[in-house]
Amino acid sequence: LGSGQDLLVKKGLYEYLDSKHNITFIRINKRITENDRESARYRISWPKKLMVRNDMHFYRFIRIFLQFLCKTGIVLFKNNRVYKDSLLFYEGRTWFIAPIAVMDYIVEYVNKHVDFYDYWEDSLASDLMFFQTIIMNSPFREKIEDELMYVKFGKTFKTMNHPVTITNKDVCLIEAGNFFCARKFELEEKEAIDYFINKIK
């Protein structure tokens, strides 16, 4: 799954995928338990008014506070939806490449487990856990490798939740790793865009 700010950065993606046709490339950071702050993503039924997409908005500080409370066992706005399956929760990243068999499994699972789908309705950033949890509780969990997407997140409070713009300084890091795609590109760093476009022509 990609977006308009992603680019191919190396030739041979299709050939590489053919050579690993049964592998799902996805970043799985860790299993999430109720002792993790990240469990607030699904344990809280997040009020929609708190979902303001502004990194310095007061509501972001409220979200952070609620997450730390959740880690200590205090769950405000508890998610009272239930799901029947006994699943382990996992968190990772949004971008992944999966074989058709895995995608079919995900679609079939969601269709058969509407309660699991509904469980995430008022969650926070569910794209970081929804697919990861399904895959890691499936027979396909044994055939997983790290994502093929280069992403660098910011290090400041304002940027830590977002990929930062790729510049010429990232070129060496991208080429040194097993990356076929990269995110995110912006026109103000056109040199990096031109470099990779010319490279994969």
Map each language-model feature to its residues.
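ER/Golgi luminal nucleotide-sugar-dependent glycosyltransferases, focusing on the catalytic module
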Residues: L1-K201
